[in-house]
Amino acid sequence: MKIYIGADFVPTDINRSAFENGDIHTLIGPKLYDMLCTTDLNIFNLEVPLTDSNTPIVKFGNNLKSPTKTVNAFKRIPSLFLTVCNNHCYDQGFEGLQSTMNVLEQHDIAYGGIGENIHAAEKPYIFTKDGIRLGIYMCTEHEFSCANDHRAGANPFDVLESFDHVESLVNQCDYVIVLYHGGKEFYQYPSPMLQRYCRKFIEKGAALVLCQHSHCIGSREDYKTGTIIYGQGNFVFHTSAFDELHDIVDNSLLIEVDIDDAGFHVSEIPLVQTEMGIRLASPEEAQLILESYKKRSKQCENAEFIIENYKQFADTHINRYLREFLGRTWIVKVINGLTRRKLVRLLLGKTSYLGIQNFIECEAHHELFLQGLKNINRK
């Protein structure tokens, strides 16, 4: 059994016409397309609602959408399975999610990770070929898209449920792949907590844990009996939001999984962004991409590096997070500019920092703080 797994596959203004016309060669090139035609299963992350309506939800972040006609490119890919379990699947609310499901079903495209409630969304996908049963478990971090008992959406990662789900799936299948939509965007290493989560999935029996959210190639860890890949980059996702990040978003990995009598094997195929889509990397490009990838993977073997590097990464983001507590009014922006972006430091002191840490870190305060914010946002 051979499987290819790609990451974010999203039509945008740059290549929408190619998607609508089903011009798959323009999007991924003839060589890569021919490869996809030789495999038993092709898996990609559909990170956009397919809908012709405009019904955006209230959220923090962009509300994505793509016309239903863009399905014409997806249906050109043989043996296709789309995970829709991500932070953008509910950007257009229930109408957008329902439209996505309807369009995929009309074109006989298999999908998973979403549903009309959490019980439907948490169902895995099981693929069988030549007597081998492969289970695909999908979950996403919480960013306005998750289903619950009374709301449609994506299957949320839940420390009290997700590991048990994988353990149960392992008992039904020969191998299990976990598609975890999470991890910090544009960070090429695991956070300490993400590493713990992914390792726990392996300990529960998963053969491969693949993190899809970072928009960049991350690193690999071969842990116990399984493999963890902390970010594979985009597949086809062209947006101006990435313009200043070309050094890390222009390359990605197609993950190849081979299952035979000798076992479960994971390898990486480097890809390079084109003006309209993606292509196979040249031998020279592939060597450079994999050298950097292997270097980062080697660094991940050092537990102290994971902790210290993440501390440095946090220092570059903390002011952005704290600014949200001050608000987004024009007067705050003006004063922040006049103080050379030091307003947060001027207004918040040691006690405030400790208070915020306690509210976020302590389970009781965290739950109450979060529920209070949700109550405000629903008014």
Locate the predicted segments by residue.
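Catalytic alpha-helical scaffold of carbohydrate-active enzymes acting on polysaccharides/glycoconjugates
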Residues: 5, 11, 15, 25-81, ...
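Active-site neighborhood of phospho(di)ester-bond hydrolases with catalytic His/Asp-centered motifs
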Residues: 5-7, 42-47, 77-87, 111-115, ...
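Active-site environment of divalent metal-dependent phosphoester hydrolases
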Residues: 11-14, 50-53, 87-101, 118-123, ...
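Binuclear metal-dependent hydrolase catalytic cores centered on His/Asp/Glu-rich metal-binding motifs
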Residues: 14-30, 64, 128-176, 196, ...
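Short acidic, glycine-rich surface-loop motifs adjacent to enzyme active sites
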Residues: 39-51, 87, 167-189
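Active-site-proximal segments of metal-dependent phosphoesterases and phosphodiesterases across multiple
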Residues: 53-75, 175-205
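Conserved beta-sheet core of the metallophosphoesterase superfamily
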Residues: 78-81, 192-253
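A short C-terminal boundary segment appended to hydrolase-like catalytic domains
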Residues: 246-247, 251-379
